[in-house]
UniProtKB/Swiss-Prot annotation:
This is Metalloreductase STEAP3. Changing E390A: 5-fold increase in Km for FAD. Integral membrane protein that functions as a NADPH-dependent ferric-chelate reductase, using NADPH from one side of the membrane to reduce a Fe(3+) chelate that is bound on the other side of the membrane. Mediates sequential transmembrane electron transfer from NADPH to FAD and onto heme, and finally to the Fe(3+) chelate. Can also reduce Cu(2+) to Cu(1+). Mediates efficient transferrin-dependent iron uptake in erythroid cells. May play a role downstream of p53/TP53 to interface apoptosis and cell cycle progression. It comes from the Eukaryota. It is a multi-pass membrane protein. It comes from Homo sapiens. GO terms for cellular component: cytoplasm; endosome; endosome membrane; multivesicular body; plasma membrane. One of its GO terms (biological process) is apoptotic process. Gene3D superfamilies: NAD(P)-binding Rossmann-like Domain.
Amino acid sequence: MPEEMDKPLISLHLVDSDSSLAKVPDEAPKVGILGSGDFARSLATRLVGSGFKVVVGSRNPKRTARLFPSAAQVTFQEEAVSSPEVIFVAVFREHYSSLCSLSDQLAGKILVDVSNPTEQEHLQHRESNAEYLASLFPTCTVVKAFNVISAWTLQAGPRDGNRQVPICGDQPEAKRAVSEMALAMGFMPVDMGSLASAWEVEAMPLRLLPAWKVPTLLALGLFVCFYAYNFVRDVLQPYVQESQNKFFKLPVSVVNTTLPCVAYVLLSLVYLPGVLAAALQLRRGTKYQRFPDWLDHWLQHRKQIGLLSFFCAALHALYSFCLPLRRAHRYDLVNLAVKQVLANKSHLWVEEEVWRMEIYLSLGVLALGTLSLLAVTSLPSIANSLNWREFSFVQSSLGFVALVLSTLHTLTYGWTRAFEESRYKFYLPPTFTLTLLVPCVVILAKALFLLPCISRRLARIRRGWERESTIKFTLPTDHALAEKTSHV
């Protein structure tokens, strides 16, 4: 284990062979680093490659010197803090007290705290690591920075990872110096204010997909509900009433029946809050009143809900491709062939069923293709290359087309099954009839908002008109242009 811990995170061969990480001249700006861990090694490598002269302070420089790039000077901590004006403190919070013996040499210098607490420590301590470091060294200027950047991102530089570096501190000159260093290293500094903001900055790396929690719980809840419903209809009912064991359907067949239901409902929930927001604006007669908190949060989570809808739809397509590979499907084909022979039927063809299958498969492929476009354009690299009109056209117009195609796909799949008594197992309606409720409401509401008497009023409200205002307001001549200026 000790031998494995001594292995460098960054290959020295790569460091010495990379021309961008060559030795820097003596007149280069000097930067100090206290610490010899993985982050300190990556930081030293990036600083050397950015043209800085790096001095690393270690308690055992002989053992750790070979782990750093050859251009970095590794020495004792007392010598490392003597000349640099900016010193990175790359040690954990519990080791801050071991640096108190250097307080005289550190007086007047800029200390850059790059540490991160654990989730338990973050909740336990009232003050941030940076504020605690500032209390131990009152004669120094402490700046919080680079704590959201991983060792790998530092190693890769601006070619990979998130380039934004939140920076906070009480001295503008110190923040400016650290910001210039971040720019020289290929990152984008973001001023987060005073050192009191360090607690919030340190919480950033601890967050685990905060915007995805509610949509994920929603998708899981829908999946569990529809899965239980399909289990009762497709597995439990034949077992209870017909003594047929169909529990083999649970891993694939029931899952494949559940996934499109979840995807369809999630897609409708992407556009339902926009309908509710438009109805609320029409009722209030103004756009200057805030939406309720629940609606505001719903609107902010539409992207995540839409991506989960696409994920479920893609899984449904994959599961559908796997259906013919099942052994149960092969047995069904053999049994059907035997029944056809026993019935002395040489030709089995139902024109209505053939057309229904062809149509609903085609509509399903079109819906999935449209959803794929929505998913691709939601990527930041693609979304940033589109102007507002292009982005709103894809996400709003094409998204609504995807919802309509999904509705037609569901209707052609169901066909006349909703009116057949045999489909109501345990007096429960077919699953697809339950999924149609919310999407049909959204489609009908969207169609209602397209009526001229409503669309013109909504367009005026979104351009600043208020029902209670006495100021006269007229739409521009190009009404179509006015409608495209705002989308909810």
